């Protein structure tokens, strides 16, 4: 298999591709340059030496000499030492006080925790000794519900089942007279099925043209494939609206 140069696929700036060798990563060839610790340290030393030079010049000048004499007269150095000593002693005293308070809090006995007394239920004297009055005798309540008579009882008594109408009222039958319903005989509801009559069947004879068309088979709608695929595509989708250009001279 042939070696493929993938650099040809990278974007180019003129004739130079952006994708170069990997050995350039981390060096000064990158955009912005590499970070150098040596240059940073040399810059710091240069700044320190410059400050030292200006300070020594100011200290050795006449103004610096007068300032030193004034500080000696006011005993400035002794005051600074006394202030530092007092500050350190104050911090030590505060630390000693905190430690002593911790020790005293641990040595002192803890005060006993007082438990709250249990709640006492109070009973009012008025409600004490009262009892529910006991009845002398038990009373039983009996309720009677008037229900309609059963079907057998209604037939035995010969009672009408509906409310009688005054103009259509008739005498009530006796107690032992049977009650019957005189119904007309059932009508013959079954009907004979009606059969349809014979219908004439029309026979049509195919024409000769239809027979020839059936013998020749279905026509093919697909165009004949040619050697050029563009002509085949044009025969499928069409060429659109045909336009005719004519030049006329007036």
Swiss-Prot record:
Domain description from the entry?
N-terminal amphipathic alpha-helix domain is essential for the membrane lytic activity.
Please provide the Gene Ontology terms (biological process) for this protein: lysis of host organelle involved in viral entry into host cell; microtubule-dependent intracellular transport of viral material towards nucleus; protein transport along microtubule; viral life cycle; viral release from host cell
Question: Can you name this protein?
Answer: Pre-protein VI
* Superkingdom of origin organism: Viruses
- Which keywords does the record carry? Capsid protein, Cytoplasmic inwards viral transport, Disulfide bond, Host cytoplasm, Host nucleus, Host-virus interaction, Late protein, Microtubular inwards viral transport, Phosphoprotein, Ubl conjugation, Viral capsid assembly, Viral penetration into host cytoplasm, Viral penetration via lysis of host organellar membrane, Viral release from host cell, Virion, Virus entry into host cell
Intervals of motif Nuclear export signal = 67-76, 231-242
Where are the compositionally biased (Basic and acidic residues) regions? Answer: 127-140
Motif range for Nuclear localization signal?
131-135, 245-248
Post-translation changes: Ubiquitinated by Nedd4 following partial capsid disassembly; which might play a role in intracellular virus movement during entry.
Does this UniProt record's set of keywords contain Translocase?
no
A single GO CC term, please?
Answer: host cell nucleus
Q: Where is this region: Involved in endosomal membrane lysis?
A: 36-53
**Residues annotated as site: Cleavage:** 33-34, 239-240
Sequence positions bearing Phosphothreonine: 143
Region annotation Binds to importin alpha/beta, involved in hexon nuclear import: where it falls in the sequence = 240-250
Residue ranges, annotated region (Amphipathic alpha-helix essential for membrane lytic activity):
34-54
Expression induction per the record is: Expressed in the late phase of the viral replicative cycle.
Q: What is the source species?
A: Human adenovirus C serotype 5
The Swiss-Prot or TrEMBL record describes its family as follows: Belongs to the adenoviridae protein VI family.
Write out the ranges of the annotated region (Interaction with hexon protein): 48-74, 233-239
Q: What else is known?
A: All late proteins expressed from the major late promoter are produced by alternative splicing and alternative polyadenylation of the same gene giving rise to non-overlapping ORFs. A leader sequence is present in the N-terminus of all these mRNAs and is recognized by the viral shutoff protein to provide expression although conventional translation via ribosome scanning from the cap has been shut off in the host cell.
Question: Phosphoserine modification sites?
Answer: 124
């Amino acid at each position: 298999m042939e070696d493929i140069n993938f650099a040809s696929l990278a974007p180019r700036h003129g004739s130079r591709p952006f994708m170069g060798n990997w050995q350039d990563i981390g060096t000064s060839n990158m955009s912005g340059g590499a970070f150098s610790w040596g240059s940073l340290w040399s810059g710091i030393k240069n700044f320190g030496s410059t400050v030292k030079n200006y300070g020594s010049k100011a200290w050795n000048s006449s103004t610096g000499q007068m300032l030193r004499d004034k500080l000696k007269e006011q005993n400035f150095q002794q005051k600074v030492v006394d202030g530092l000593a007092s500050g350190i002693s104050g911090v030590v005293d505060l630390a000693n006080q905190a430690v002593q308070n911790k020790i005293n809090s641990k040595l002192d006995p803890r005060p006993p925790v007082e438990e709250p007394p249990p709640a006492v239920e109070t009973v009012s004297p008025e409600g004490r000794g009262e009892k529910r009055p006991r009845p002398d005798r038990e009373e039983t309540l009996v309720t009677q519900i008037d229900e309609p008579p059963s079907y057998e009882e209604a037939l035995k008594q010969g009672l009408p089942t509906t409310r009688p109408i005054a103009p259509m009222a008739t005498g009530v039958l006796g107690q032992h007279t049977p009650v019957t319903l005189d119904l007309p005989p059932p009508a013959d509801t079954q009907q004979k099925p009606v059969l349809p009559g014979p219908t004439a069947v029309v026979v049509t004879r195919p024409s000769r043209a239809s027979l020839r068309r059936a013998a020749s088979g279905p026509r093919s709608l697909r165009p004949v494939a040619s050697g050029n695929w563009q002509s085949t595509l044009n025969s499928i989708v069409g060429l659109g609206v045909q336009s005719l250009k004519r030049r006329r001279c007036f």
